A protein has these predicted regions:
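Short loop/turn motifs that initiate or flank beta-strands
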Residues: 1-286
């Protein structure tokens, strides 16, 4: 800018009653006053993914102790910070009407960019007990504000070791799995989902041939390996720990159709017993 005398300007004056006159006007330039900050300028925080326009700038400009009214705005309010944390941005101060002797002013201020929140959903399908360790089939989805990939990790304890693999479970029951979802410039999202292993439905299919040496009693010792069960379409054996037996006896059919204990030697006897499931991993159908 140039301040002081910058030259002259000739001005021709024409009227109806007088001769034309030529005036010489001396031109003097004076720079506008640039106001300065009175104290600090502040900006309200924004969230990653938002533009600077969301943030409000607060400050005061002065000139020789006198407040200069005007407005603060971002030099480029459409700017979107590329990361969370402290971000340096330029502001522009425009003097208000009535303060034309003042020039616009610019400067930088640190604006806090907070991590954005993730939108996540985790669901697990239920399973039936198989006797083996199982991993639940899950659907985990995560959405970040800038399409950054979301990484999921899992643990069977809230403060446990989180890994990319879903914990395995064996016995029937309901289990809580903890997850963390993370993406750059976003707050980690945590939560839980339930893994359910349902008891395996079974029905008695057959009993193996059983024999004993005559001892004068119809009582029989029965073990789980003598029984075959049907589960869905598969034939299975249950471990001894899954069943308990009571009142197991050889019986014979009477003339009236009833069955009575039969301790005598002979073949073709019926077997009568009561069995009780002692494992929560199975359930009788029907």
């Amino acid at each position: 800018q140039t301040e002081g005398s910058v030259g002259t300007v000739g001005v021709k004056i024409t009227t109806d009653n007088y001769q034309d006159m030529l005036l010489t006007v001396k031109v003097i330039a004076k720079n506008k006053i640039v106001p300065v900050l009175d104290g600090e300028i502040t900006a309200t925080p924004i969230t990653f993914g938002q533009i600077l326009r969301v943030s409000t700038i607060t400050g005061t400009m002065k000139d020789d102790g006198k407040t200069v009214e005007g407005t603060f705005d971002w030099t480029d309010s459409s700017t979107k910070p590329d990361k969370a944390g402290d971000y340096q941005a330029e502001w522009t101060f425009t003097p208000a009407e009535g303060y034309e002797e003042y020039a616009t002013a610019t400067g930088n201020v640190t604006i806090k960019v907070k991590p954005a929140e993730l939108t996540v959903s985790v669901k697990a399908s239920s399973m039936y007990y198989t006797g083996e360790e199982q991993i639940a089939s899950i659907i985990a989805s995560g959405q970040s504000v800038d399409s950054t990939p979301v990484t999921f990790t899992y643990s069977d304890k809230e403060d446990g070791n989180y890994t990319s693999g879903v914990p395995t479970f064996t016995d029937a029951g309901t289990y809580t799995v903890y997850y963390k979802a993370e993406a750059a410039n976003h707050e980690p999202a945590t939560g839980t989902f339930t893994v359910t292993i349902d008891p395996l439905p079974i029905s008695l299919l057959s009993v193996s041939s059983i024999s004993k040496t005559y001892d004068g009693s119809a009582d029989v010792t029965l073990t789980a390996d003598k029984l075959t069960f049907l589960s869905k379409t598969a034939k299975i054996k249950l471990p001894d720990t899954a069943l308990s037996f009571s009142d197991a006896q050889f019986t014979s059919k009477q003339a009236d159709g009833s069955y009575l204990p039969s301790p005598e030697v002979g073949n073709g006897k019926a077997l009568s017993f009561t069995m009780t499931l002692t494992s929560n991993n199975y359930v009788f159908e029907g």
